[in-house]
Swiss-Prot record:
The keyword Hydrolase applies. HAMAP family: 3MGH. InterPro entries: Formyl_transferase-like_C_sf, MPG, MPG_sf. This is Putative 3-methyladenine DNA glycosylase. It comes from Synechococcus sp. (strain CC9311). Keywords: DNA damage, DNA repair, Hydrolase. CDD domains: AAG. Gene3D superfamilies: Methylpurine-DNA glycosylase (MPG) (3.10.300.10). Pfam families: Pur_DNA_glyco (PF02245). Its EC number is 3.2.2.-. GO terms for molecular function: alkylbase DNA N-glycosylase activity; DNA binding. It is an enzyme of class 3 (hydrolase). The lineage of its organism: Bacteria, Bacillati, Cyanobacteriota, Cyanophyceae, Synechococcales. Belongs to the DNA glycosylase MPG family.
Length: 212
């Protein structure tokens, strides 16, 4: 299902937004839009509700102690997709942050989609599948309104209430509090222990009628 909207409602984030450490950019991406321009000109979009940060000095980072053709994008210019395949099955979509020659990035873990099942993009693999993102999109810029871009938050999410917790599915640096999610969202891949899913009547649900 696509969600037509006027492109002016989805102003691309500037590259300067991404020229900061991942642990700064990660929480600030919560509430921003992931947008895809489809072949018919319509826009498929959702609200980012969960992210994780990774840095070169972090043992869980792909760029920790190694630089290779497979992770070269992670060492490159900020504001580009870094897409890799996890366990040979799922694509995971990251955004490169900080500076060139320093592996740093934010993993997009979950997106809330208007008018669709609440968990259709609740996890990195599901997110990539819903938007059709794969290795061919590795190194593609996210700062311009091309096929894909990231856009600023809507006014209703100027100050989102976030949960800060540890990352998921890693064997090292498990204690770093570098995962964030929108507390009122039901589209988060996994909630922190003790944090109950909000009732449907109280949950954040993106709507096609938003006015920005």
């Amino acid at each position: 299902m696509s969600h037509p909207a006027h492109p002016r409602r989805f102003s691309a984030l500037p590259q300067a937004f991404f020229c900061r450490p991942a642990e700064v950019v990660g929480p600030e991406l919560i509430g921003c839009f992931l947008v895809k321009r489809q072949n018919d000109g319509s826009l498929l979009w959702g609200v980012i509700v969960e992210t994780e940060a990774y840095s070169q000095d972090d043992p869980a980072c792909h760029g920790y102690r190694r630089r290779s053709p497979q992770n070269e994008t992670l060492f490159g210019e900020p504001g580009r997709f870094y897409v890799y395949v996890s366990y040979g099955i799922h694509h995971c979509v990251n955004v490169v942050t900080d500076r060139s020659d320093w592996a740093n990035g934010v993993l997009l873990r979950a997106v809330a989609m208007p008018g669709e099942p609440e968990r259709v993009a609740a996890g990195p693999g599901l997110l990539a599948r819903r938007f059709g993102l794969n290795r061919t999109h590795d190194s593609q810029a996210v700062c311009g309104e091309n096929e894909f871009w990231l856009a600023s938050r809507p006014s209703v999410l100027n100050v989102p209430e976030l949960v800060t917790t540890t990352r998921i599915g890693i064997s090292q640096a498990q204690d770093l509090p570098w995962r964030w999610y929108l507390q009122d969202s039901r589209s988060v891949s996994r909630r922190a222990r003790g944090d109950r899913m909000p009732a449907l009547s109280q949950a954040f649900i993106p709507t096609l009628e938003w006015k920005r």
